[in-house]
Amino acid sequence: MELSVHTFVSLDGVMQGPGGVQEDPSGGFDRGGWLVPHTTEGQLEPVGEWFGRADAILLGRTTFEMMRTYWSQVTDPDNVVATALNTGQKYVVSNTLTDAGAAWGKTTVLRGEDVVEQVRRLREQPGGELQVHGSWQLVRTLHDAGLVDVHRLIQFPVVVGAGKRLFDGGAVPSAYRITESHVAAGGSGAVALTLRRTASGTTGAGEFVVRDGRESTA
């Protein structure tokens, strides 16, 4: 399976608590819900497309508990996101959740110090996509291990100014190629991007030079 990461992100890279004031107040974060005033009808349609591609969903504990609280209440059979989360295969990374505490449809708890290897084995299984949603700490771990094949983002035209960022200091350098991009419906200016990894451990490097009076690269 391909491992894909799905994120709502601000202009300054913040991914913490986009959907509610108390969605993720960890670290004293008090700017939650920043996405909501900037959404318009049709703007989040790509999210349904994302979940429609999932063979399995992989979450960190905080995101798992937040999603379970909200999405287990959505019983609309036409809601693709709810169907994927409530009935599809899920994996949650946690050393504190019991099997009973992780009860939500088909959920398996990944425990232990070898989470990267457990995810690597899942990724090696046949199928379509193993999708990560939210799950800031897990995303960073998988990125640094070189396991993320695809990032799908919706970037909103807002600067949050604080909070957990998708990539902050110390992230392993990587290069991606944009394979899809479009301005989301509704006129708010949010941009949906799909990026496929082309290199891990380096961005590549070069410089601009002038040769024979012409600008060039080297």
Predicted ranges, named:
Residues M1-A218:
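Enzymes that bind and transform nitrogen-containing heteroaromatic metabolites
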